[in-house]
Amino acid sequence: MARFPEAEARIFKKYICLRCGATNPWGAEKCRKCGYKRLRPKAREPRGGGR
């Protein structure tokens, strides 16, 4: 992962749409592609485990 704050801000200060998975800017109220209002912050740790 990123080791310094500038890189972490650039990589993780984004929202992901829960409907279509599009990446959106940090200040977004709704998805830029589908208009859905439910957005989650980009995960800082990987999900699952890959098994």
Swiss-Prot record:
Keyword Ribosomal protein: yes
Keyword Phosphoprotein: no
GO biological process: translation
Family: Belongs to the eukaryotic ribosomal protein eL40 family.
Native organism taxonomy: Archaea, Methanobacteriati, Methanobacteriota, Thermococci, Thermococcales
Classification via InterPro entries: Ribosomal_eL40_arc (IPR023657), Ribosomal_eL40_dom (IPR001975), Ribosomal_eL40_sf (IPR038587), Ribosomal_zn-bd (IPR011332)
Listed transmembrane segments: none
Gene Ontology MF term list: structural constituent of ribosome
PANTHER family: 50S RIBOSOMAL PROTEIN L40E (PTHR39649), LARGE RIBOSOMAL SUBUNIT PROTEIN EL40 (PTHR39649:SF1)
Name recorded for this polypeptide: Large ribosomal subunit protein eL40
GO cellular component entries: ribonucleoprotein complex; ribosome
Keyword terms, alphabetized: Ribonucleoprotein, Ribosomal protein
